[in-house]
Design a protein with these regions (language model features):
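Bacterial N-terminal signal peptides that target proteins for export
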Residues: 1-10
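Sec/Tat signal peptide C-region and signal peptidase I cleavage site
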Residues: 19-25
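Transmembrane beta-barrel domains of Gram-negative outer membranes and organellar outer membranes
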Residues: 25-261
Length: 261
């Protein structure tokens, strides 16, 4: 089977798998595997992350609202300062029947990268994200995410690996160590305008003592990127949860635009 058709078959298979997998709950405000590239110096990227939980948790757990039929809208604004540094800011919101539109919290995300002029064999950058979320949306109100980013474009093929580590700074799990949350993306350029691939998002528990499989979170997103122009970013996908601790079915879309300021 030719590589492009093998990948297309895998995307379709993963999408169909959603009809037979169990459900549960976790936060889903920005669903994205990061690439190495930074926003260019003196430019600003504005993104809207829209995520709708088609089938999620249906009861309040530890004071946190259920995710079923929740629409999460996140605004991300990132400015490039140099060829090795950018900084992003997030505004998280949630919309649910009967509760209206709620502000969830804000995060700030500085990121550094190996400059392209060094010509390393892979892209390498490091993101650190710190922020607050209201108790009704998370049992941990202040958190820190440390995300190394490694990626590579080889012809039409692309892969990215984000071995992410999360830490509570205030809340229910503040005494717990770093939680390992790996994210992975494989994609293929079917045409100059259309890229298809698979995105994986996981959270397996403390880095030194993984949780039992049933308590871990694992999501698989068949996803499409539309390469409309260098200024636009368009990504959408349908995610399937494959453990009882993961929301069963989520639709996501990212729409971004690069401004020359």
């Amino acid at each position: 089977m030719r590589p492009r058709f093998a990948l297309l078959f895998a995307i379709c298979l993963a999408a169909l798998a959603g009809t037979a997998l169990p459900a549960c709950a976790q936060d889903n405000y920005e669903i994205q595997v990061y690439g190495y590239d930074l926003v260019e110096p003196h430019h600003t990227m504005v993104e809207l992350h829209s995520n709708f939980t088609i089938d999620g948790s249906k009861t309040i757990q530890d004071g946190v609202r259920p995710t079923n039929h929740a629409e999460h809208e996140t605004i991300e604004i990132t400015h490039g300062f140099t060829d090795w540094f950018e900084c992003g800011f997030y505004i998280f919101t949630s919309v649910q029947n009967g509760d209206g539109w709620d502000w969830v919290g804000d995060h700030i995300r500085p990121r550094v990268a190996i400059p392209k002029k060094w010509k390393w064999p892979v892209g390498l950058s490091l993101s650190n994200e710190v922020g607050y979320q209201r108790p009704r949306f998370s049992t941990d109100t202040w958190t820190w995410e440390m995300r190394p980013i490694i990626d590579k474009q080889s012809g039409r093929w692309y892969w990215s690996f984000n071995p992410t580590f999360d830490k509570s700074l205030h809340g229910a799990t503040v005494n717990q160590g770093f939680v390992f949350s790996p994210n992975v993306k494989f994609s293929y350029d079917f045409t100059k305008k259309i890229t298809g691939g698979i995105e994986y998002y996981g959270s397996v528990g403390p880095a030194t003592d993984f949780l039992p499989t049933g308590q871990q979170q694992h999501q698989i997103f068949p996803a499409i990127d539309l390469n409309l122009s260098p200024k636009w970013e368009v990504n959408f996908g349908l995610g399937v949860g494959v453990t009882h601790s993961t929301d069963h079915l989520i639709a996501k879309m990212i729409l971004g635009y690069r401004f020359d300021f």
